[in-house]
C-alpha cells in the first residue's frame, strides 16, 4: 500500500503523476470502463483528473448578466487518478507509462513501457 504523504493542507496518496494534461487516457474501472478521452486538468491535492467526455454531470446555472437565460449545462466531473490509464493512440490499446532518462540531452522524457518509445 502506498504511504500517505503530506502536501499542503491535505494528505495525498500519489507523489508522482505519470499522467499529464492533454494525454489521452482510458477509464479502467467504474461505469465509464473502456471509454477514452483527453485529460483537461489535474487536481494534485485530491488525486483527481478531469477527462473530456467522461463522468458528465448536470449543472444548474442561475441567470447572470453573461448568461441571462440560465439553464442546465453538462460539465465533466473529476475521476480518481487510479481509475484511468494512459492510452496509446498509435497501437490503439492501453499502455503503462514510466519515466526514463534520455541519454543524448540528459533530460527526463516519458517512455511507453512495452516498446520503450518516447511519448
UniProtKB/Swiss-Prot annotation:
GO terms for molecular function: rRNA binding; structural constituent of ribosome. Keywords: Ribonucleoprotein, Ribosomal protein, RNA-binding, rRNA-binding. SUPFAM superfamilies: Translation proteins SH3-like domain (SSF50104). GO terms for biological process: translation. GO terms for cellular component: ribonucleoprotein complex; ribosome. Belongs to the universal ribosomal protein uL24 family. It comes from Leptospira interrogans serogroup Icterohaemorrhagiae serovar copenhageni (strain Fiocruz L1-130). One of two assembly initiator proteins, it binds directly to the 5'-end of the 23S rRNA, where it nucleates assembly of the 50S subunit. This is Large ribosomal subunit protein uL24. Pfam families: KOW, ribosomal_L24. Signal peptide: none annotated. Part of the 50S ribosomal subunit.
Amino acid at each position: 500500500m502506498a504511504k500517505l504523504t503530506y502536501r499542503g493542507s491535505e494528505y495525498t496518496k500519489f507523489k508522482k503523476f505519470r499522467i499529464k494534461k492533454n494525454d489521452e487516457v482510458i477509464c479502467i474501472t467504474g461505469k465509464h470502463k473502456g471509454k477514452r478521452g483527453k485529460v483537461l486538468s489535474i487536481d494534485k491535492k485530491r488525486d483527481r483528473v478531469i477527462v473530456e467526455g467522461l463522468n458528465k454531470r448536470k449543472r444548474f446555472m442561475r441567470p447572470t448578466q453573461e448568461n441571462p437565460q440560465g439553464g442546465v449545462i453538462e460539465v465533466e466531473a473529476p475521476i480518481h487518478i487510479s481509475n484511468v490509464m494512459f492510452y496509446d493512440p498509435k497501437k490503439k490499446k492501453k499502455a503503462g507509462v514510466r519515466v526514463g532518462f534520455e541519454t543524448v540531452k540528459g533530460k527526463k522524457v516519458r517512455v511507453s513501457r512495452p516498446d520503450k518509445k518516447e511519448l
